[in-house]
Amino acid sequence: MQSRALSRLRSYYKRSSVFPSSDNDRSVQLFNLVRSIYSSSSRPRVPQPEWLIGELCKVGKIAEARKLFDGLPERDVVTWTHVITGYIKLGDMREARELFDRVDSRKNVVTWTAMVSGYLRSKQLSIAEMLFQEMPERNVVSWNTMIDGYAQSGRIDKALELFDEMPERNIVSWNSMVKALVQRGRIDEAMNLFERMPRRDVVSWTAMVDGLAKNGKVDEARRLFDCMPERNIISWNAMITGYAQNNRIDEADQLFQVMPERDFASWNTMITGFIRNREMNKACGLFDRMPEKNVISWTTMITGYVENKENEEALNVFSKMLRDGSVKPNVGTYVSILSACSDLAGLVEGQQIHQLISKSVHQKNEIVTSALLNMYSKSGELIAARKMFDNGLVCQRDLISWNSMIAVYAHHGHGKEAIEMYNQMRKHGFKPSAVTYLNLLFACSHAGLVEKGMEFFKDLVRDESLPLREEHYTCLVDLCGRAGRLKDVTNFINCDDARLSRSFYGAILSACNVHNEVSIAKEVVKKVLETGSDDAGTYVLMSNIYAANGKREEAAEMRMKMKEKGLKKQPGCSWVKVGKQNHLFVVGDKSHPQFEALDSILSDLRNKMRKNKNVTSDAEEAEFLVI
């Protein structure tokens, strides 16, 4: 004869609609367990419905758990807490609170703590505080939960205050406070607390090692690491990461070589460290030796090659990743490889990657679609970029995506199309941002739409909610400078609100040099010198402007002032990549092994330029680059 519990179970589980149909689902496995009870001839061990409710809540099947819960004739506090916790895990605090309030006097400290934790997880700190204060009793877990909530919200002092009030503490309490202080960079306080700990475990030691290393105190971190009574792989990784992040890659490598075991984080940290140190060969060698690679490993290598402008190598690694097939690209992978395609103007490769993205879960990701727009833009495929935008392939038409499309047109000199895109954006109810205006000014500048650009700048000035950045002023200079209307900029030179830097004034002076605007240049130089800025570039530019306009005495005077102040112009430099080798050239430097041949070629070019009257001033003659 079957037990009473089995009879109760049968009434609940005959309604198979309670459960979903997926065989891979743990809830179905639970259902199959119950079915086996009915088919068993021997007397089975019957799981209680309360147990099944708890299991369903653990796997997120709250709807099924709730149906079973509502059908129970009697419920104990454990079952109530299971269902409340199930709702909390899904972020449904409204339903969790409704059940919590129904429990009344039956709820225990576990139920209360679960609710406090739920409100903290949902960023409702004030409600969590009130609930914590209302608790009829608290245990150490309750205190730890609230302390961690304060710490995660950045209220470290409040967390410390609560920590001091605790009637009893366990090692989790101490570790939580140490980690919280470390994360906020309050290392001395963390160390003081660490030294006061009655007992330390590997988590305590690792938190301090990690905190010291991340705050630049690598040697102190190493001394602590060496004193650890026991270490786990997280401890080793913390120390290696500390060395790598502080540009001490050789020491990181030495430690890496003697690790008793390594995980993905160990290998990936070292690869990242070598890449940051511009040692791509070592990074590649380590990557090839990895026993197993995850998506971070592949993405790190791809990103490293992109950052080092070795875009073809990045594409090769991406191809190997696809052939390997053990992991799928993530958002970071796609963004990096699309950046490589953009730099190479590799439209075919970019289109192939677009096809992969369209079949992945990332096809609507905002960052990925923005990278696709950028790739099509740099490849000159404006129609493809616009098609993506118009056909809804961009995840959502928010301000970022509108700005991206305006930038696409702006950077290709399609000023009118950029403005039309802006007008459509306004019709859709979007308010322009500072970035929007920057793109519009750039578009107008490169399309020669001076009046329209000036209108946009005035709109920006009138909108007090938006910051006026240096880049806006620099774009304005470029806009007016290209049209030979630098006088329109002078009104902004004396504007008190315009926090302008040397690069802004340098842009005006460069434009004055092109358009021979001596009077405006003098006004700008006066303003620069009034700010107390003594920059060699200012004197050199003004000297060149004087020289270009035949004012040799004034030019010589500027050079003399520069000399009296002990200012020297930073030597110009440039570099070119031939094959896989970078060649650096600095003004006045003759150390390059092919200097004589290069100097001869440049001299021939210089003579041809003179014959074609391409050299326009004595100033330019003096500034001629000598390798």
Swiss-Prot record:
<dbReference type="GO" id="GO:0003723">
    <property type="term" value="F:RNA binding"/>
</dbReference>
<feature type="repeat" description="PPR 6">
    <location>
        <begin position="201"/>
        <end position="235"/>
    </location>
</feature>
<dbReference type="InterPro" id="IPR002885">
    <property type="entry name" value="Pentatricopeptide_rpt"/>
</dbReference>
<dbReference type="GO" id="GO:0009451">
    <property type="term" value="P:RNA modification"/>
</dbReference>
<feature type="repeat" description="PPR 2">
    <location>
        <begin position="76"/>
        <end position="110"/>
    </location>
</feature>
<feature type="repeat" description="PPR 9">
    <location>
        <begin position="294"/>
        <end position="328"/>
    </location>
</feature>
<feature type="repeat" description="PPR 5">
    <location>
        <begin position="174"/>
        <end position="200"/>
    </location>
</feature>
<feature type="region of interest" description="Type E motif">
    <location>
        <begin position="504"/>
        <end position="579"/>
    </location>
</feature>
<dbReference type="Pfam" id="PF20431">
    <property type="entry name" value="E_motif"/>
</dbReference>
<keyword id="KW-0496">Mitochondrion</keyword>
<feature type="repeat" description="PPR 10">
    <location>
        <begin position="330"/>
        <end position="360"/>
    </location>
</feature>
<dbReference type="InterPro" id="IPR011990">
    <property type="entry name" value="TPR-like_helical_dom_sf"/>
</dbReference>
<feature type="repeat" description="PPR 7">
    <location>
        <begin position="236"/>
        <end position="262"/>
    </location>
</feature>
<feature type="repeat" description="PPR 1">
    <location>
        <begin position="45"/>
        <end position="75"/>
    </location>
</feature>
<comment type="similarity">
    <text>Belongs to the PPR family. PCMP-E subfamily.</text>
</comment>
<keyword id="KW-0677">Repeat</keyword>
<feature type="repeat" description="PPR 4">
    <location>
        <begin position="139"/>
        <end position="173"/>
    </location>
</feature>
<dbReference type="InterPro" id="IPR046848">
    <property type="entry name" value="E_motif"/>
</dbReference>
<feature type="repeat" description="PPR 8">
    <location>
        <begin position="263"/>
        <end position="293"/>
    </location>
</feature>
<protein>
    <recommendedName>
        <fullName>Pentatricopeptide repeat-containing protein At2g35030, mitochondrial</fullName>
    </recommendedName>
</protein>
<dbReference type="Pfam" id="PF13041">
    <property type="entry name" value="PPR_2"/>
</dbReference>
<feature type="transit peptide" description="Mitochondrion">
    <location>
        <begin position="1"/>
        <end position="44"/>
    </location>
</feature>
<keyword id="KW-0809">Transit peptide</keyword>
<dbReference type="InterPro" id="IPR046960">
    <property type="entry name" value="PPR_At4g14850-like_plant"/>
</dbReference>
<feature type="region of interest" description="Type E(+) motif">
    <location>
        <begin position="580"/>
        <end position="610"/>
    </location>
</feature>
<feature type="repeat" description="PPR 12">
    <location>
        <begin position="398"/>
        <end position="432"/>
    </location>
</feature>
<feature type="repeat" description="PPR 14">
    <location>
        <begin position="469"/>
        <end position="499"/>
    </location>
</feature>
<dbReference type="GO" id="GO:0005739">
    <property type="term" value="C:mitochondrion"/>
</dbReference>
<dbReference type="Pfam" id="PF01535">
    <property type="entry name" value="PPR"/>
</dbReference>
<feature type="repeat" description="PPR 3">
    <location>
        <begin position="111"/>
        <end position="138"/>
    </location>
</feature>
<feature type="repeat" description="PPR 13">
    <location>
        <begin position="433"/>
        <end position="467"/>
    </location>
</feature>
<feature type="repeat" description="PPR 11">
    <location>
        <begin position="365"/>
        <end position="396"/>
    </location>
</feature>
